[in-house]
Amino acid sequence: MLRVLHRAASALVMATVIGLAPAVAFALAEPTSTPQAPIAAYKPRSNEILWDGYGVPHIYGVDAPSAFYGYGWAQARSHGDNILRLYGEARGKGAEYWGPDYEQTTVWLLTNGVPERAQQWYAQQSPDFRANLDAFAAGINAYAQQNPDDISPEVRQVLPVSGADVVAHAHRLMNFLYVASPGRTLGEGDPPDLADQGSNSWAVAPGKTANGNALLLQNPHLSWTTDYFTYYEAHLVTPDFEIYGATQIGLPVIRFAFNQRMGITNTVNGMVGATNYRLTLQDGGYLYDGQVRPFERPQASYRLRQADGTTVDKPLEIRSSVHGPVFERADGTAVAVRVAGLDRPGMLEQYFDMITADSFDDYEAALARMQVPTFNIVYADREGTINYSFNGVAPKRAEGDIAFWQGLVPGDSSRYLWTETHPLDDLPRVTNPPGGFVQNSNDPPWTPTWPVTYTPKDFPSYLAPQTPHSLRAQQSVRLMSENDDLTLERFMALQLSHRAVMADRTLPDLIPAALIDPDPEVQAAARLLAAWDREFTSDSRAALLFEEWARLFAGQNFAGQAGFATPWSLDKPVSTPYGVRDPKAAVDQLRTAIANTKRKYGAIDRPFGDASRMILNDVNVPGAAGYGNLGSFRVFTWSDPDENGVRTPVHGETWVAMIEFSTPVRAYGLMSYGNSRQPGTTHYSDQIERVSRADFRELLLRREQVEAAVQERTPFNFKP
């Protein structure tokens, strides 16, 4: 156990950022010595799953297929109902299995050819990896067969699942949620669980650490709802590889992964890998280069479950243009979607090869296959190499910036039809920079390290925007650039930063103006803000008021620039914006914020953690940390308050792991919402109190550690 207090972390961050000696000292273990080679991994002689006290499966397999089988079995035990539902959707049978609520998803996936393409992709896997996919599916089936009462009757019809189902789910998640989403194509915008995605990542080189060991932060921020973004923690060991980390349920490979030699993490990068084309309809077809072209119209249908349990066949009218499948928006606009990477069946195997690479060269060779369609990927290893890659399948475009390609692109001319994509070497990347770290917090790829090593002028303008970097992203750069001699403990403390950077940038102008306002309530609010330490801690009495003011000053998502005296500039990407352009207007906004805070929370000085609660099952504990656009590096997005002024997380920290590549590796982390959501589980709310206390648990890699913590053993036999 390693506990890091919120206040201690805040004090440490403040001290280091302003250049003072650290105000807090942690009880540290002796520095780990670093032999020339990592310790040998445990080599299993039998197949078994050892479950620790937090429901984490430590899966030991005599070979790769056995480990994948055990991993499928473990996922089914922990999340079986949800995985089967996701697999049923990816088959294009959600409407048939569960009715009209799934009809739009079914139409989206069938029109885009996901189930059919998944069958093709499955056949294109290498024989060895196809065997792993089959084994993973077999593990899911075996759990369901052995424990039929633990699987909801609603989803049993999906069984048995196949390796092709595994591919279909991964294909849907990556290519038709992350890269192309129905909301963007249909003009409805992304749903909150997709739009609010975010993550933090750091990799630190040995020269910037106290013990000469590289450090890595894995810290995805996603929706807390139960869906395709729910994370699962696991540990796989065979004689040939070891993988620890987390990934979305239903995936057979761990994307946020590490072992005794190396680790990787991912953040959403916003690469525009899909293009939505506005078609001009004419004479039953569409205009293209001055000619009317007919649509391709393949025959298709699907089944729809009725309220009485029967199903009916429904015809599906599919139209395809030269660009891709065509959809009709609510306003009648015909939109064709073209998705890059539909010729890349090897995403899962590439991830597996990346996280089992024996060297950075091997890792880069796997990355260069360009099968992973999107994401920033950050790497660190025991040899001291760190790397940031703005990864993804990026179309080569002859003209236009990213704003043009994010919108509706004219579909009546071949000048906008892309046919090629960029190789890895064309994309922004940094390896072992002079600053000694790489980072990304969903910012564009222009400040992956500090000082910067390239500029936007070095790349096509359609790759990434030159728009304001969020205050969270700016804080990420500052926390790394302004801190040296990092230990793992200090690294963990910095990860807990929940400073309101926007308060630092605005309160010096707002408070003096509010103090001279004739309204006593405004003056009292100004004094409250002046006494605030500008941290989103549970005992803060001004944080809720500031949040309400910032919502008026910078907009509902806290990202507006108009109110600042000095707007964001690419020339000063981590110190702008700042100042208040119109102090009088800002004071009027404070006046409104006072009323809003009272209405929502009962008082302007209600403690932050009294209103912001971590509630799962019967656990109800105070929360800390805030919105990333306010500058909090540790992120929680809160629901609207209820009638009692209480709100809970809807998005934010899910999996967090901090790794030191010592010998042996040391790692600490948490899965905020627990490691299982299957009915009857005891591992849904069992980590939330630790989240509230910032009490990270040690992640157990060595066999002796696992044996000391084991709560249950599951031996298994696997025969392909």
Swiss-Prot record:
Signal peptide residue numbers: 1-29
Cellular component GO terms, alphabetical: periplasmic space
The species this protein belongs to is: Pseudomonas sp. (strain SY-77)
EC number of this enzyme = 3.5.1.93
This chain belongs to which protein, by name?
A: Glutaryl-7-aminocephalosporanic-acid acylase
Top-tier EC class: hydrolase
Keywords carried by this UniProt record: Antibiotic resistance, Hydrolase, Periplasm, Signal, Zymogen
Would you kindly state one Gene Ontology biological process term found in this protein's UniProt entry? Answer: response to antibiotic
Q: At the top level of its lineage, which domain of life is listed?
A: Bacteria
